[in-house]
Amino acid sequence: MRRGAPQDQELVGPGAPGRGSRGSPPSSGPVVPVLVFPPDLVFRADQRSGPRQLLTLYNPTGTALRFRVLCTAPAKYTVFDAEGYVKPQSCIDIVIRHVAPVPSHYDVQDRFRIELSEEGTEGRVVGRKDITSVLRAPAYPLELQGHSEPTPNPGPPVWTGLTPARHLQENAPQQLATSSFLLFLLAGVISVAFLLLPLQDELGSQLPQVLHVSLGQKLVAAYVLGLLTMVLLRT
């Protein structure tokens, strides 16, 4: 066998019906383009959920097509839905899992073949496409996985910039509390002043008419004063 020639392929996945053949060229007639994504499969041995890839198969025609997935190394892979049907103008996702992620299989290229045929048990093959598959080694050696990388010695700490920063952080809540207290105190003084002012219809007051307030304003001032009292009591 010449180098690079495809080997006999088998269906992979649950319920595979046995060995397939290399297959003769498609019969005369329209040839359907086999549209798959991604065009190549790259598995990573350090994937948490296990080396797996999602292969999407598209059917651009107006009729349903039967598909099947073959592989040159069926013992290394599990294909969910290795054969079935693709609806017209639709697509289907095929999950392919590498079940033998051992070092001897790193960087070894395998080959998958996607065959499309007409609907029916004796449907003729109308399209096929070969895609390569490769298993990549982990990004880090296995003995280093699960261990944190050693951190370099940070050296002596720099105290020059730390002291002012800590001082500002400690003083910030105190400044905020002081400003809030002054704001509450000012609002309380204004509310008390509104309560002491005479009503608009009150007679005999020596204050000018502009300083007379309405009953509604006094009620609002009393409400605000009550809220401030509750806040101060809780703090």
From Swiss-Prot:
Name used for this protein in its record: Motile sperm domain-containing protein 3
Gene3D superfamilies according to UniProt: Immunoglobulins (2.60.40.10)
Disorder noted: Defects in Mospd3 are a cause of defects of the right heart ventricle and of high mortality in newborns.
GO CC, alphabetical: membrane
Tissue specificity comment: Detected in heart, kidney, liver, spleen and brain.
One Pfam family in the UniProt entry: Motile_Sperm
Keyword line: Membrane, Transmembrane, Transmembrane helix
Entries under PROSITE patterns matching the protein: MSP (PS50202)
Family annotation (PANTHER family): MOTILE SPERM DOMAIN-CONTAINING PROTEIN 1, MOTILE SPERM DOMAIN-CONTAINING PROTEIN 3
Species of the source: Mus musculus (Mouse)
